[in-house]
Amino acid sequence: MDNDVLRQAPLFSSLDDEAATALGSSMAETTLRRGDVLFHEGDSGDKLYIVTEGKVKLGRSSSDGRENLLAIMGPGQMFGELSLFDPGPRSATVTAVTDATFGSLSHDDLLRWLDGRPQVARGLLSQLASRLRKSNDVVADLVFSDVPGRVAKALLDLADRFGRTADDGVHVHHDLTQEQLAQLVGASRETVNKALADFASRGWLRLEPRSVVIMDLERLSRRAR
């Protein structure tokens, strides 16, 4: 496992090369093809996962089959940490958006790493705090922001993590369908498409298959506020 990717995870950002190499060698590796499910909401499990290649989506389903996307994650991001403290069922379904590879640590293996490594424990607390803050932001956005504002904010978040700056703007290969993007912002596909078309007509971005090119970050940022 690439040490640089491993250290992108807040939990392990403070590890030196020797410790990161030892940790990487103790992690099990899992590979999924696009569309494959790693685990379902309600499954039992006690592993923490770190994405090393590709992208995954974390989602929850309602009783009538509707899906809400909680997050899109890429290399260096981790999920499943709640199971280390609460052995209850998984709270979300994890599906590969692209071909993806993960490293995983079991509950017992991570506890051994936490023992005598206070910096790793602090990293875990930081990750949990960040996740809680993100949840609070999502709730606030659903209450106070309109759909175009939520779309703009989602695009900026994706650009921050997956964007590549070029002469014509920031290329964001998010690999999401229009329906998945709508699920991510908690709105209908039609409403999200209308917001995207409006942004494009204003010259803020250019739409491409499963990607966008953001040409005016400043105005898109203002719309996200």
What is the predicted function of each stretch?
Residues 190:
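Key DNA-contact positions within bacterial/archaeal DNA-binding proteins
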Residues 198-199:
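Basic amphipathic alpha-helical segments that dock to polyanions
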